[in-house]
Amino acid sequence: MSTKRRKTSDEPSALKKAAAPSAPELKKEKKVKDKSTKDKSSTKKTEKTEKKQDAPEPAEESTPATNSTEEDSVTLDVAPEQEEVETVKKTFKDLGIVDALCEACERLGYKNPTPIQEQSIPLALQNRDIIGIAETGSGKTAAFALPILQALLDKPAPLFALVLAPTRELAAQIAQAFEALGSLISLRCALILGGMDMVTQAIALGKKPHVIVATPGRLLDHLEKTKGFSLRSMQYLVMDEADRLLDMDFGPILEKILKFLPRERRTFLFSATMSSKVESLQRASLRDPLKVSVSSNKYATVSTLKSNYVFIPHMHKDTYLVYLCNEFAGQTIIIFTRTVLETQRIAILLRTLGMGAIPLHGGLSQSARLGALNKFRAGSREILVATDVAARGLDIPNVDCVINHDLPQDSKTYVHRVGRTARAGKSGHAISIVTQYDLEIWLRIEAALGHKLDEYPLEKDEVMVFKPRVEEAQRHARNEMKSLMENQGKHGGLLKRKRGNGQGGGRDHMDAEEG
């Protein structure tokens, strides 16, 4: 986002004009219905004792703005003796968000706050450190972006906030969200990723952006090597997908980054799970935080998601995959595989059969990965074949179906994969292909979910109609993969990544995310 400026230190007039109130007043969340009935005429005492009072009518249900699974975990149970309560949909204005940002939310189609936003935004506006625990697709980005932008409106300053994300795709997505929400207030946002030119990034940092969104490895490179770059005046720190940051061994880098930051700051830590590593990071980086959780359990999936499986012989996996893609033809599909090579092969297989498939994995260059995501988001490709690089954090709207061609190795990854669909209250479908070799993993996944999943209804004869065409496409895919590997072998191999410009290359591979 480009913005004309007279001086680097001058803040945009739009920031000053739309200054936010320092202590926004929150409106009441619920209206209480008085349903107690009074008798106009006196009755006999014996009738009162003999007849029991009629049970109160159930409160009217309001259509939830987001999935009900999340709401259940943060709503207090009402005792039968208590008066009934009608839940009223809140707006962002009700949470204390100023008009300029509410207008930006409306433009982006954010009608009502999600549960994590509803719980965390008022606390963030009170200048509290926050730990937010919520499933993927729950709207965590806006939950921390809106309070930061509102604080920036109140007291404009350069290098105001830093957001750390585990992967380049997630960082790019967060930066886009900040730019979209801050479009009416002349926000300047810098995206600092590994694999990009350090000099160009240093120039962007020298322009003193309001918000920096970065992957940890490349940010530390700039803190250590870029002359004149300092975050000592930074006021907000966000660590998004904190559990993923620590799973990718960013812990030592985060410790070093924290030493470059001021102690007097607000810190928001958002995560899908609360592991022991995340708790350690919390103790090291947050002060007297308030915990907000809208996760019903560790392996929760949203209520709008329909999950099924097909149990088949391993030799027919591709045939069943093609059948399922044909069943969901015209809809957007993400297919998850376990390896980079399998991702590439499946994409070639489906393209050979005339389907618009595109691969996404850690072996691709950064520009190729962003290009694949943009094509899928824009609808020019209806099928995204991906490794777990796409399972966490990426905001890919309107995904109709997720197919697990290869099962993940753990239950947590399963939840994150299927969380790519049925986002923000929308419905979605997830189907897992289970073979005789996957039974142990599948039983562990069902045990973690706490219930058995239903088998997807299909007729074997209808599936086997695709077998001859699939076998022909498999042969073509094998030949193309062989040629691809031979060509890539001459240039360092499909799985090898090129270093950046020689600066910080040792850390660049970490935020690239393995395939």
From Swiss-Prot:
Motif (Q motif): 90-118
One GO CC annotation: nucleus
Family annotation (SUPFAM superfamilies): P-loop containing nucleoside triphosphate hydrolases (SSF52540)
All residue ranges annotated as the Helicase C-terminal domain in the record: 316-464
Entries under CDD domains matching the protein: DEADc_DDX47, SF2_C_DEAD
GO biological process: rRNA processing
Stored InterPro entries: DDX47/Rrp3_DEADc, DEAD/DEAH_box_helicase_dom, DEAD_box_RNA_helicase, Helicase_ATP-bd, Helicase_C-like, P-loop_NTPase, RNA-helicase_DEAD-box_CS, RNA_helicase_DEAD_Q_motif
Keywords, sorted A to Z: ATP-binding, Helicase, Hydrolase, Nucleotide-binding, Nucleus, Ribosome biogenesis, RNA-binding, rRNA processing
Chain ranges of the Helicase ATP-binding domain: 121-292
UniProt-recorded Gene Ontology molecular function terms: ATP binding; hydrolase activity; RNA binding; RNA helicase activity
Biased composition (Low complexity): 15-24
Keyword set includes Transcription: no
Residues binding ATP, per UniProt: A134, E135, T136, G137, S138, G139, K140, T141
Acidic residues bias spans: 69-85
Enzyme class: hydrolase
Placement of sequence motif DEAD box: 240-243
Compositionally skewed regions (Basic and acidic residues) per UniProt: 25-55, 506-515
Domain notes: The Q motif is unique to and characteristic of the DEAD box family of RNA helicases and controls ATP binding and hydrolysis.
Family: Belongs to the DEAD box helicase family. DDX47/RRP3 subfamily.
Protein role: Required for pre-ribosomal RNA processing. Involved in the maturation of the 35S-pre-rRNA and to its cleavage to mature 18S rRNA.
UniProt protein name: ATP-dependent rRNA helicase rrp-3
Species of the source: Neurospora crassa (strain ATCC 24698 / 74-OR23-1A / CBS 708.71 / DSM 1257 / FGSC 987)
